[in-house]
From Swiss-Prot:
Primary role: This is one of the proteins that bind and probably mediate the attachment of the 5S RNA into the large ribosomal subunit, where it forms part of the central protuberance.
Coiled coil start-end: none
GO biological process, one term: translation
Record protein name field: Large ribosomal subunit protein uL18
SUPFAM superfamilies, per database record: Translational machinery components
Example of a GO MF term: structural constituent of ribosome
Keyword RNA-binding among record annotations: yes
Lineage summary: Bacteria, Pseudomonadati, Chlamydiota, Chlamydiia, Chlamydiales
Cross-referenced HAMAP family: Ribosomal_uL18_B
């Protein structure tokens, strides 16, 4: 008999793999990955060819803390999207592949995407 926690975590991992198997990011068009927990949001630009993170921001980062973006909510998620777009522009990145992970495209995840678009990134 499977525990409900095992079913929940394995289902989440399956959903994330299903989304990521169709996505590949390179240095010209990196993957914009969004991970959310109960308290925080993490956003990163990833080059899958080299296996490197090009840029990273979260609600735990010093830049976010000085801006007052310390909570997981939709307003802060949009601001994080704008900040990651600024970091991407500094790396001459203007096109990305959006990776929502195992999460639905609504709420915090959608606001990160909207903020990144508003900041100048193209999906």
């Amino acid at each position: 008999m499977e525990s409900s926690l095992y079913k929940k975590t394995s289902g989440k991992a399956r959903r994330a793999l299903r989304v990521r198997k169709a996505l590949k990011g390179c240095s010209l068009k990196p993957r914009l990955s969004v991970v959310k927990t109960n308290k925080h949001v993490y956003v990163q630009l990833i080059d899958d060819v080299e296996g490197k993170t090009l840029a990273f921001i979260s609600t735990l980062a010093k830049v976010a803390k000085t801006s007052g973006l310390t909570r997981k909510n939709q307003d802060n998620a949009k601001a994080l999207g704008i900040k990651i777009a600024e970091l991407g522009k500094g790396l001459q990145v203007d096109r990305v592949v959006f990776d929502r992970g195992a999460h639905k495209y609504h709420g915090v995840v959608a606001m990160v995407a909207d903020g990144a678009r508003e900041g100048g990134l193209q999906f």
